[in-house]
């Protein structure tokens, strides 16, 4: 199972909170996209999208970006939420970083990092 792959679904994923997107660069080369935004009503950050080029995925870039977000959240007693597709190997990374599955849909696991869990 995976996310819808039609052109409109792909475009919607890219445009969702597009203003919050950051291009990830290593040595002046664009290697990925990182998109997270703060949800004040929930006192949490939402990690909406992280994409790293395949040839850079073993360089711990995603780990570093997520760790930086977790540190920012922890410093302010905030949580971090995300959704991950079922079957995605990224779920193991999120679990190693302290995220826990709090619910699921047909396609995704919804995960949450509580800053108090790390204290």
Which residue stretches match the model-derived regions?
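Conserved GNAT-fold acetyl-CoA-binding loop/helix
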Residues: 1-13, 19
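Conserved beta-strand in the GNAT
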Residues: 23, 29-38, 44-46, 51
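A conserved beta-turn-beta hairpin within the catalytic core of GNAT-like acetyltransferases
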Residues: 38-48, 57, 76, 107
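Conserved acetyl-CoA-binding loop-helix of GNAT-fold acetyltransferases
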Residues: 52, 58-71, 92-96
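Conserved active-site alpha-helix within GNAT-family acetyltransferase domains
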Residues: 63-64, 86-110
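Conserved GNAT acetyl-CoA-binding A-motif
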Residues: 73-85
């Amino acid at each position: 199972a995976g996310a819808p792959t039609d052109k409109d679904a792909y475009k919607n994923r890219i445009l969702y909170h597009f203003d919050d997107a950051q291009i990830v660069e290593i040595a002046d080369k664009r290697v990925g996209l990182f998109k997270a935004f703060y949800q004040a009503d929930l006192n949490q950050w939402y990690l909406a999208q992280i994409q790293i080029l395949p040839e850079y995925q073993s360089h711990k870039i995603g780990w570093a970006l997520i760790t930086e977000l977790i540190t920012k959240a922890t410093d302010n007693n905030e949580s971090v939420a995300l959704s991950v597709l079922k079957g995605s190997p990224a779920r193991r990374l999120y679990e190693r970083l302290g995220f826990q599955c709090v619910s699921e849909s047909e396609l995704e696991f919804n995960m949450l990092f509580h800053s108090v869990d790390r204290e």
